[in-house]
Amino acid sequence: MNVCVMGLGNIGLPVVQHVSKVYRQTQGYDISLEAVNAVKKKGIDASTELACADIYVIAVNTWHRNGYSDMSAIEDCTKQALKLNPDALICFESTLAKGTARKLAEKYNSSNMAVCPHRWWKQEEDKYGVIQLRVLGALNQESQKKALDFYNTLGIPIHVVSSLEIAELSKLVENTYYYLRIAYAEDLKLLCEDNRVSFEELREAVNTKWNVDMAEARDGIGGECLPKDIQILIDTYPNMPLLHGAISTDKNYRAKIAHNPFGSKPETQQIEENNNSNNKSHGT
């Protein structure tokens, strides 16, 4: 069984490393020679020329730019892979806008397609690496069986859902949910600062309740995934005022801390600055 991992960036690199431990005939592919050489240095076959494979794992970037969801790299990889092997199983691990996989299956006449979004987190790769529970949706029963066989062989536990679209949305909703949590914390922190109340002490207090897990508020919502994924979800479902409000909250928060950084005036702010000095960054 030949496996090709397409896209050797932050996600594709750990993926190809893991896959190559299980499947001897594994190749990494990327248009970046630098990315290819980084994989080769780890003793794994890689190239800027795409090879024929039985399974293609697509882990390239997707974007939200110029006001729309950009899935162009996904389509380009799908087109190239199916040109080499029309019967190959295509496994998307990238973030996809809802409906992307099905549209590509119809456009390029593929009957073997699955969506299994990554949940990899660089800051805690040992705990949240390639091997962790993942969501998988497939085009049909045959695709589902092939994809399950593949991921089971890799030792990756799978939660099966009924469609490609549910799997696509799961990644967007996960990251949007976290975005909303952080935006609420940002709003609350500004409220606390205006009223000379310690946000960190308040957060610690409310987090003692079993069903409360208030996020931290730091220097705005960053990372590669959170700001992008909430916009992609809005493209699909524009009539969600809560999401628009969260984006506005983060913009407002960023503007205020840029103008008047925390820790420069009241004692409560200095306490929060010190407490946050060792915080980990937000995940993606």
Set out the residue ranges of the language-model regions.
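NAD(P)+-binding Rossmann beta1-loop-alpha1 motif at the extreme N-terminus of oxidoreductases
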Residues: 1-51, 270-279
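NAD(P)-dependent Rossmann-like dehydrogenase/reductase catalytic/cofactor-binding core
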Residues: 2, 52, 145, 193-284
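Electropositive phosphate-/nucleotide-binding environments in soluble metabolic enzymes
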Residues: 29, 68-75, 98, 141, ...
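Alpha-helix C-terminal capping/helix-to-coil transition sites in glycosyltransferase folds
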Residues: 51-52, 131
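Rossmann-like NAD(P)(H) cofactor-binding subdomain of soluble oxidoreductases
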Residues: 52-55, 63-124
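Internal alpha-helical scaffold of NAD(P)-dependent oxidoreductase catalytic cores
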Residues: 105-114, 121-122, 126-212, 236-239
